[in-house]
Amino acid sequence: MTIKDFDTKKVILEDQYKSDKYETMTLYFIAPKEWLEGLYPDAVHTEISVEYPLNCPEAYAATVMVSPTRNLGEDGYEDYDWSDLEMSLSDIEALIGMAKS
């Protein structure tokens, strides 16, 4: 999947998860549901994850994925149907930079 008109100003850093076991850092971002291009009408927003090795926090080493998020009411929210997201290195660098600032 690709996102047309990607804009970091429309993205919010939601969480960071460091895995000592796998030696990775995963960043989670909330983005507009419109970026899913209507594929998931029940989505409340788009979730983007960026995962990279702890010893190489660089865009070229990152894996980027995207998922719709749905509201489960009292049970909270659920990210589902994860898929690979193709992004430019500069956009990935911008997302990693958001977590560093």
Predicted regions and their residues:
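Extreme N-terminal leader/activation tails
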Residues: M1-S19
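Short intrinsically disordered terminal tails
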Residues: M1-K4, E74, G97-S101
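Acidic, low-complexity, intrinsically disordered interaction modules
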Residues: S19-D91
